[in-house]
Amino acid sequence: MLVIEDVRAYEVLDSRGNPTVKAEVTLSDGSVGAAIVPSGASTGSKEALELRDNDERFGGKGVLKAVANVNETIADEILGLDAFNQTQLDDTLRELDGTNNYSNLGANATLGVSMATARAAAAALGMPLYRYLGGANASILPVPMCNIINGGAHANNNVDFQEFMIMPFGFTSFKEALRSVCEIYAILKKELANSGHSTALGDEGGFAPNLANNTEPIDLLMTCIKKAGYENRVKIALDVASTEFFKDGKYHMEGKAFSSEDLIERYVELCAKYPICSIEDGLAENDFEGWIKLTEKLGNKIQLVGDDLFVTNEDILREGIIKKMANAVLIKPNQIGTITQTMRTVRLAQRNNYKCVMSHRSGESEDAFIADFAVALNTGQIKTGALARGERTAKYNRLLEIELESDEYLGEKL
């Protein structure tokens, strides 16, 4: 049996220049695993707590408290644990914290240790991470949801919807699907420049121009898909992140106030006009009646993804399944705090025929853990930004590596 012999953490920077936690775990045979924890901008209120220092350093965004929790409290408790028993490790972290949302230790402390331990164990066995976590059945390359126009909390522009994405379904390999996205992205840059729009990038590598409304970005994407020659092979996905503009029972966008019913009708109209296959967070995280109506209206036609609605939480997802809210769940490990809890949520979703989308955060790093994790859990879909910025392309490049060993691309079978 290999045991955890050493644990350490320290501050590094994420893609927004904010501190985050890097954890390193060393096993008794000398194997080492490391992981960098991401950070979100648009966050659900029920997410696990990301512990920040709230002092004068980095405008209060330092993570020395979380680092100290790893180096002192967590290390003392987990040294000597079986490195191959991920469930035992993660349950120990949860019990050590003693809260439902990691408000004592910080989910950025616990997740870093959880991820790093999995990496160390995989290294000790000479296995790729996806194979270690997923076993023999880990084989499916996910369809990417590529966010190539950014709005909302991810960009400094006047677009309300947060992400305008393209999904390359009509391909037999991941590399060919990714090629189509690259070509569409390049055409989009030219289209924006030629029309006098900014080609500045948002947090996730997509372009962030000021546009007339929330429909113009979709029209732009359709133009670029057609010019690239990929009509009927690439579809549109939206992350509305509507909690961000929900106030006093209304959705405030484009200078108007919409009721839940109004917004649902807007989505129905958009889906009738455009090849939209997925809408994420179409309604606010606490607008449960609205979610039920939205699911009744569109749930048998398109994918309705709950992000802020479910926050990768098994118990919250279970309630949503019972109430028939949404039909898919976004999977963000740092929303819940450990690898094991993330896997439990995915399994619950899959048992109940809810689709899963593995996801990055807007504050990312070069760590490509979620690429392996998506394949390990056969989520079939992944959100990891545009084809720009190294912290985004790191995940795509890792998936291209995995494809050399496992070449089943879900594509149209999704």
Curated annotation (Swiss-Prot):
<keyword id="KW-0324">Glycolysis</keyword>
<keyword id="KW-0963">Cytoplasm</keyword>
<keyword id="KW-0456">Lyase</keyword>
<dbReference type="GO" id="GO:0005576">
    <property type="term" value="C:extracellular region"/>
</dbReference>
<comment type="pathway">
    <text>Carbohydrate degradation; glycolysis; pyruvate from D-glyceraldehyde 3-phosphate: step 4/5.</text>
</comment>
<dbReference type="InterPro" id="IPR036849">
    <property type="entry name" value="Enolase-like_C_sf"/>
</dbReference>
<keyword id="KW-0479">Metal-binding</keyword>
<feature type="binding site">
    <location>
        <position position="239"/>
    </location>
    <ligand>
        <name>Mg(2+)</name>
    </ligand>
</feature>
<keyword id="KW-0964">Secreted</keyword>
<dbReference type="InterPro" id="IPR020809">
    <property type="entry name" value="Enolase_CS"/>
</dbReference>
<dbReference type="InterPro" id="IPR020810">
    <property type="entry name" value="Enolase_C"/>
</dbReference>
<feature type="binding site">
    <location>
        <position position="361"/>
    </location>
    <ligand>
        <name>(2R)-2-phosphoglycerate</name>
    </ligand>
</feature>
<dbReference type="GO" id="GO:0000015">
    <property type="term" value="C:phosphopyruvate hydratase complex"/>
</dbReference>
<comment type="function">
    <text>Catalyzes the reversible conversion of 2-phosphoglycerate (2-PG) into phosphoenolpyruvate (PEP). It is essential for the degradation of carbohydrates via glycolysis.</text>
</comment>
<dbReference type="InterPro" id="IPR000941">
    <property type="entry name" value="Enolase"/>
</dbReference>
<dbReference type="Pfam" id="PF03952">
    <property type="entry name" value="Enolase_N"/>
</dbReference>
<feature type="binding site">
    <location>
        <position position="362"/>
    </location>
    <ligand>
        <name>(2R)-2-phosphoglycerate</name>
    </ligand>
</feature>
<dbReference type="GO" id="GO:0006096">
    <property type="term" value="P:glycolytic process"/>
</dbReference>
<feature type="binding site">
    <location>
        <position position="280"/>
    </location>
    <ligand>
        <name>Mg(2+)</name>
    </ligand>
</feature>
<feature type="binding site">
    <location>
        <position position="332"/>
    </location>
    <ligand>
        <name>(2R)-2-phosphoglycerate</name>
    </ligand>
</feature>
<feature type="active site" description="Proton donor">
    <location>
        <position position="204"/>
    </location>
</feature>
<dbReference type="InterPro" id="IPR020811">
    <property type="entry name" value="Enolase_N"/>
</dbReference>
<dbReference type="InterPro" id="IPR029017">
    <property type="entry name" value="Enolase-like_N"/>
</dbReference>
<feature type="binding site">
    <location>
        <position position="383"/>
    </location>
    <ligand>
        <name>(2R)-2-phosphoglycerate</name>
    </ligand>
</feature>
<feature type="active site" description="Proton acceptor">
    <location>
        <position position="332"/>
    </location>
</feature>
<dbReference type="GO" id="GO:0004634">
    <property type="term" value="F:phosphopyruvate hydratase activity"/>
</dbReference>
<protein>
    <recommendedName>
        <fullName>Enolase</fullName>
        <ecNumber>4.2.1.11</ecNumber>
    </recommendedName>
</protein>
<dbReference type="GO" id="GO:0009986">
    <property type="term" value="C:cell surface"/>
</dbReference>
<keyword id="KW-0460">Magnesium</keyword>
<feature type="binding site">
    <location>
        <position position="307"/>
    </location>
    <ligand>
        <name>Mg(2+)</name>
    </ligand>
</feature>
<feature type="binding site">
    <location>
        <position position="162"/>
    </location>
    <ligand>
        <name>(2R)-2-phosphoglycerate</name>
    </ligand>
</feature>
<dbReference type="Pfam" id="PF00113">
    <property type="entry name" value="Enolase_C"/>
</dbReference>
<dbReference type="GO" id="GO:0000287">
    <property type="term" value="F:magnesium ion binding"/>
</dbReference>
<comment type="similarity">
    <text>Belongs to the enolase family.</text>
</comment>
